[in-house]
Amino acid sequence: MTLQFEAFCAGGLAPGWSLTVQGHADAGEEKFEINFLTDAGDIAFHVKPRFSSATVVGNAFQGGRWGQEEVSSIFPLTLGEPFEMEVSADAEHFHIYAQEQKVLQFPHRHRPLATITRVRVLSEHRLAQVELAKRSLSWGDGGY
């Protein structure tokens, strides 16, 4: 797979960060993954759509070993069609959406989140756009 995108998360990951990837899933090109990395070399979160099995897999690589995979059979992606995937983080989970449909919720296995400092997207697909954004989270009525 080819490194298509890499970004440094200033101050580390925090609730409110999101990554959106848009591209085209060409037939015969089934490989695509997103990795959230720590400075220590761990993969705090790895998400990979598997077109051959129509599943989305989440996992973490810590201390030199992979953890237990979490697999979702909710798979709205189609080879030969454009796609959009979004990964967002709150205080407890990563949330993965494909084609605006929630496909997986993955609990944070790596703490603190601030030690997650890089994001990599590897793909054989043509990526049209990758956006890493930090949105502020608010709660309540805003004083109105």
UniProtKB/Swiss-Prot annotation:
Homodimer. This is Grifin. The gene is Grifin. The keyword Phosphoprotein applies. Keywords: Lectin, Phosphoprotein. GO terms for molecular function: carbohydrate binding. Residues 5-133 form the Galectin domain. The galectin domain is atypical and does not bind beta-galactoside sugars. The modification Phosphoserine is found at residue 138. It holds the Pfam family Gal-bind_lectin.
